Amino acid sequence: MKGKEEKEGGARLGTGGGGSPDKSPSAQELKEQGNRLFVGRKYPEAAACYGRAITRNPLVAVYYTNRALCYLKMQQPEQALADCRRALELDGQSVKAHFFLGQCQLEMESYDEAIANLQRAYSLAKEQRLNFGDDIPSALRIAKKKRWNSIEERRIHQESELHSYLTRLIAAERERELEECQRNHEGHEDDGHIRAQQACIEAKHDKYMADMDELFSQVDEKRKKRDIPDYLCGKISFELMREPCITPSGITYDRKDIEEHLQRVGHFDPVTRSPLTQEQLIPNLAMKEVIDAFISENGWVEDY
């Protein structure tokens, strides 16, 4: 549980009225005790220590983010979210506060908000040159995939309702036409002619039903393929790569993203941290071929 050193006003209490010194631990000592408990996976006890540190000094953002992580480990996202928001009130540039807040919102299925906070955490980490490895990108990929799955589930439900509605309409129209045919031929003795007309009505509506089922089946088949494999997504933007290039470390990035990283953040590989210059980027032609084939077979990808 690393964090920048905090300045604590009145962390240690002095003597009062000539009495003996207060031996109770300072906020910093409570935080360090919480860190040790966290490493030992004693999350409730660690959270309690951070809570006592907050009581001692409620103006240090890292105490809240540390406790928020404990709450996340204990699967209590609501409590974690409250701590993250308080941490951001104290330090709006806190990477951990945005990161943990995004994780809380992911757990609570607030995918748009989760993605916004995780992207903010990623941007701040780059600006502050903090290395979180693949933790933030991994959480962002999960959030985007879950948001997409949520959209797909909603679409499936809407399509199912539409299919049921159209089925009822076709069935009702079939019954209406059959009843009308029967009324129009009341008193007629030519049953063969009536049966022939009814058969035509049945066949027409059977075809309507079959055509509709085929159309929905085609839509369903296309929908089943709506998933972009992780290996086709850039490790910086997390979107489908358009111009993949490979670094000497063997990592593939989308060219515009890695060039922006080199210009704005520094001349190093964002994953391996190895030194890297723009001249060392080599087009990954094999990956480009795979991506182009994927796009040609999945026109929906532009809306992903």
Swiss-Prot record:
What is the tissue specificity?
Expressed in the brain.
**Pathway connected to this protein:** Protein modification; protein ubiquitination
Any Pfam family the entry gives: ANAPC3
EC number(s) recorded for this UniProt protein: 2.3.2.27
Spans annotated as Required for interaction with MAPK7? 102-201
An annotated Gene Ontology molecular function: Hsp90 protein binding
**Where are the TPR-type repeats located?**
27-60, 61-94, 96-128
Keywords in alphabetical order:
Cytoplasm, DNA damage, DNA repair, Isopeptide bond, Mitochondrion, Nucleus, Phosphoprotein, Repeat, TPR repeat, Transferase, Ubl conjugation, Ubl conjugation pathway
Relate the induction remark in this record.
Answer: Up-regulated by inflammatory signals in Treg regulatory T-cells (Treg).
- The segment annotated Required for ubiquitination of FOXO1 runs over 144-304
The record lists the effect of H261A as: Loss of E3 ubiquitin protein ligase activity
Q: Which reaction does it catalyse?
A: S-ubiquitinyl-[E2 ubiquitin-conjugating enzyme]-L-cysteine + [acceptor protein]-L-lysine = [E2 ubiquitin-conjugating enzyme]-L-cysteine + N(6)-ubiquitinyl-[acceptor protein]-L-lysine
What does the record say about PTM? Answer: Auto-ubiquitinated; mediated by UBE2D1 and UBE2D2 and enhanced in the presence of MAP2K5. Monoubiquitinated at Lys-2 following cell stress by UBE2W, promoting the interaction with ATXN3.
What's a single GO BP term from this record?
cellular response to heat
Record domain U-box: where: 227-301
Q: What class of enzyme is it?
A: transferase
Its primary localisation, in coarse terms, equals cytoplasm
Q: Where in the cell is it found?
A: Cytoplasm; Nucleus; Mitochondrion
Q: What happens when the gene is disrupted?
A: 95% of knockout mice die at birth, surviving mice have decreased longevity. Reduced levels of CHRNA3 ubiquitination in the brain.
User: What is the role of this chain?
Assistant: E3 ubiquitin-protein ligase which targets misfolded chaperone substrates towards proteasomal degradation. Plays a role in the maintenance of mitochondrial morphology and promotes mitophagic removal of dysfunctional mitochondria; thereby acts as a protector against apoptosis in response to cellular stress. Negatively regulates vascular smooth muscle contraction, via degradation of the transcriptional activator MYOCD and subsequent loss of transcription of genes involved in vascular smooth muscle contraction.
Q: What's noted about domains in the record?
A: The U-box domain is required for the ubiquitin protein ligase activity.
Cite the record's note on assembly: Homodimer. Interacts with BAG2, and with the E2 ubiquitin conjugating enzymes UBE2D1, UBE2D2 and UBE2D3. Detected in a ternary complex containing STUB1, HSPA1A and HSPBP1. Part of a complex composed of STUB1/CHIP, VCP/p97, CHRNA3, and UBXN2A that modulates the ubiquitination and endoplasmic reticulum-associated degradation (ERAD) of CHRNA3. Within the complex UBXN2A acts as a scaffold protein required for the interaction of CHRNA3 with VCP/p97, this interaction also inhibits CHRNA3 ubiquitination by STUB1/CHIP and subsequently ERAD. Interacts with MKKS. Interacts with DNAAF4.
Protein name per its UniProtKB record: E3 ubiquitin-protein ligase CHIP
Species: Mus musculus
What taxonomic classification does the UniProt entry list for its organism?
Eukaryota, Metazoa, Chordata, Craniata, Vertebrata
